[in-house]
From Swiss-Prot:
Residues 561-627 bind DNA. Disruption phenotype: RNAi-mediated knockdown at the L4 larval stage results in less than 10% embryonic lethality in offspring and surviving adults are sterile. Double RNAi-mediated knockdown with hmg-4 at the L4 larval stage results in 60% embryonic lethality in offspring. Double RNAi-mediated knockdown with hmg-4 in embryos results in defective cell cycle initiation, duration and completion and in failed development of the anterior pharynx. This is FACT complex subunit ssrp1-B. Residues 638-650 have a biased composition (Polar residues). The lineage of its organism: Eukaryota, Metazoa, Ecdysozoa, Nematoda, Chromadorea. It comes from Caenorhabditis elegans. Expressed in the germline. Residues 434-565, 592-689 are annotated as: Disordered. GO terms for biological process: DNA repair; DNA replication; nematode pharynx development; nucleosome assembly; nucleosome disassembly; positive regulation of cell cycle; regulation of chromatin organization; regulation of embryonic development.
Length: 689
């Protein structure tokens, strides 16, 4: 048998089990992952040891290599052991040893570095094994060794950190430090340089804003080491995928940003970006420990002695070591004359940089948003008040989520708008802010915030309603008083009785003779003046009464039919629970629903449009029956009041003369008193006759 093939076998790759096909031939072991996954090729001469031990909950094959590495395959059947045993013994002259894992659940044992693997065992029985290549960083802290691991994005459950406590044996004191020796042994096979090697460059007391602190930075050919007062980091050069150099808004500082994948960790916090801050006028001479071969390798971009601003020399150094371009801002300039726009994101103050191929936000959290990830942008009014000098900038991603940058200065609106147009990025409210106007016609504020324009429209409608409902706005008191005086003079000349509608005869001439007292001329101006004051006072109190009427209008009739529901609301209520995930707020669910509704076809929406049409027909039928039974009659009370008042100006004046200054329920009592006084005057006049 020259070939042995197993399907449905998986290989362990940084905590992720990649499924594929394992093929054993006379000269090699070949594993090909399904759907273009990981592939492994091992020659027969590189195989050192073979062990049959479980991987997960199924039997597995551990293939030890001659260089100290190992590959583990799982998903076999118990009967496959005999097949593999006979094949390896006949073709490779290798036997398979059965190795049982110690699974008592103990958390203590012996931690050793065997080959390129960290093996934790108890009395020579293995408990678990971790390849040293999976380790991203080792921190030695007194009697404790902290291991941090690389991450596999395909794995749902990932090993982030592991700590080994190594107590000191007081009876057998040794000069060697167990933790430090363990650290050196792991670093030897983890692809990270040990501290004993000579770095290319040493940068001291460098301010790092993310993660916060001052660090000494050692630059190696394949890694970068950061040493702080509390934390140390080792970053492989291959994990650095982008470099940014951007100025601060004040023009005095410069940010140098490193993008990392996978990110480094500090406790439970991940840092996908490192931000170094340098003074723009700060200069420093750097001496690089480079050989002639290394200088030739970097094509003359680096020199043994480099002078100039520190941010320039460091950016050139990292550009050569990482073999990456340094991304700088393009031609965009904000109102401050710099490429930075000050704003806030989730209550954190920061700077937004429109770059040539994306947006860079510094600093909590640091984000780089590429244009290819953006579906559209939106300008919205800030929520700080009705009259505001700031706006919000929203970025909608193709994944369905959105990012909001708030409190941007209004002067940045047009500059950012023109920038998006040049980059051909879709803008939902595609218009600039050119004119500044006040009042209801403020087009710039209405364009930024559609909700505000709606509120203003409602305000205009309310003003129109108040003009229509006002019965005393066009009333002229002086004309009415002159008319009364003319009517009074004409009635005295003709000897006729005064009109009962005007109470002048009953108030001024109790004898009924039609003649006035000598002091009547002095009393008339006082009464006129008092009426003018009372009229002004009533006009001031009018808005209070109008508000009371308007509040009454807003009260909803409980018998009024329920309004018709739109197709989107019916669909949203039916599918809200299925779209909600753990931790989602109502706003998150609404955004997901809106995006999903827009993507639905007309056929998908047909069911809900039909339901909305049925609900609309139901509402129209119920509303017709409601109005037929007298519903909504109260709305006609305003115009009828105006009509009655327009027909009788005299009665209108009388009502204003006798209206009380208060809004109590005793408003009719002055009218009753006046009527009694008038009746008494008529009786006395009859007795005198």
């Amino acid at each position: 048998m020259t070939e042995l093939k197993f399907k449905g076998v998986y290989v362990e790759d940084i905590g992720h089990l990649t499924c594929g096909t394992l093929t054993l031939t006379e000269n090699s072991i070949n594993f090909i992952g399904d759907k273009g996954g990981k592939s492994v090729y091992i020659t027969g001469t590189d195989v050192d040891k073979l062990k049959w031990q479980k991987l997960g909950n199924k039997p597995g094959l551990r293939v030890g290599l001659s260089d100290g590495g190992a590959h583990r395959f799982g998903g076999f059947l118990d009967d496959d052991l005999q097949k593999i045993q006979s094949f390896t013994s006949s073709n490779w002259s290798k036997s398979i040893n059965q190795s049982n894992l110690f699974i008592n659940g103990w958390n203590y044992g012996q931690a050793d570095v065997k080959g390129k693997n960290i093996e934790f065992s108890w009395e020579n029985e293995p408990i678990f094994e971790i390849p040293c290549t999976n380790v991203s960083n080792v921190i030695a802290n007194k009697n404790e060794a902290i291991l941090e691991f690389h991450q596999n994005e395909q794995s749902k459950v990932q090993l982030m950190e592991m700590r080994f406590h190594m107590p000191v044996d007081l009876e057998n004191e040794e000069d060697t430090d167990k933790v430090e020796e363990f650290k050196k042994a792991v670093l030897a096979y983890a692809g990270l340089e040990a501290e004993t090697e000579q770095p290319i460059c040493l940068l001291t007391d460098i301010l790092c804003t993310t993660p916060r602190g001052r660090y000494d930075i050692k630059v190696y050919p394949t890694s970068i080491a950061l040493h702080g007062k509390t934390y140390d980091y080792k970053i492989p050069v291959k994990t650095i995928n982008r470099l940014f150099l951007v100025p601060h808004k004040d023009g005095r500082q410069v940010y140098f940003v490193l993008s990392l994948n996978p990110p480094i960790r500090q406790g439970q916090t991940h840092y996908s970006y490192l931000i170094f801050e340098f003074g723009k006028d700060e200069e420093e001479d750097l001496e690089l420990s480079l050989t002639d071969e290394q200088l030739d390798y970097f094509n003359g971009n680096l020199q043994r002695e480099m002078t100039g601003p520190i941010y320039e020399t460091i950016s050139i150094l990292f550009k050569s070591i990482c073999n990456l371009k340094v991304t700088v801002p393009g031609r965009f300039l904000g109102s401050s004359g710099t490429p930075a726009i000050q704003c806030t994101h989730r209550q954190n103050l920061g700077l937004l940089y429109p770059m040539e191929k994306g947006f860079l936000f510094i600093q909590k959290p640091v984000m780089y948003i590429r244009f290819e990830e953006i579906s559209s942008c939106h300008f919205a009014r800030s929520d700080s008040g009705t009259v505001t000098r700031t706006f919000d900038f929203e970025i909608d991603l193709k994944t369905g989520s959105s990012l909001t940058f708030s409190a941007m200065d209004k002067e940045e609106n047009n500059k950012l708008f023109d920038y998006l147009n040049k980059k051909e990025i879709k803008i939902r409210n595609s218009h600039r802010i050119d004119n500044k106007s006040a009042g209801y016609g403020s087009s710039d504020e209405d364009d930024i915030d559609p909700y505000k324009s709606t509120v203003k429209a409602e305000g205009r409608e309310q003003d129109d309603d108040s003009d229509d409902e006002s019965t005393d706005e066009d009333y002229d008191l002086d004309k009415d008083m002159k008319k009364q005086k003319n009517d009074k003079d004409s009635s005295e000349g003709s000897g006729s009785e005064p009109d009962d509608e005007y109470d002048s005869g009953s108030e001024k001439d109790a004898s009924g003779t039609g003649e006035s007292d000598p002091d009547e001329e002095n009393i008339e101006p006082k009464k006129k003046e008092s009426k003018e004051k009372k009229n002004k006072r009533e006009k001031k109190e009018k808005p209070v009464k109008e508000k009371a009427v308007k509040k009454g209008k807003k009260t909803k009739d409980p018998n009024e039919p329920k309004r018709a529901t739109t197709a989107y609301i019916i669909w949203f209520n039916a599918n809200r629970n299925s779209m909600k995930e753990d931790g989602d707020t109502l706003g998150d669910v609404a955004k997901k629903a809106g995006a999903k509704w827009k993507s639905m076809s007309a056929d998908d929406k047909k069911e809900w449009n039909d339901k909305a049409a049925q609900d609309k027909a139901r509402y129209e039928a119920e509303m017709k029956e409601y109005k037929k039974n007298g519903g909504g009659v109260e709305k006609a009370s305003g115009p009828s009041t105006k009509k009655s008042s327009d027909q009788s100006p005299g009665k209108q004046f009388k009502s204003k003369e006798h209206i009380s200054d208060t809004d109590d329920s005793d408003d009719d009592e002055p009218l009753k008193a006046k009527k009694d006084e008038s009746d008494a005057a008529s009786e006395s006049s009859g007795e005198s006759d």
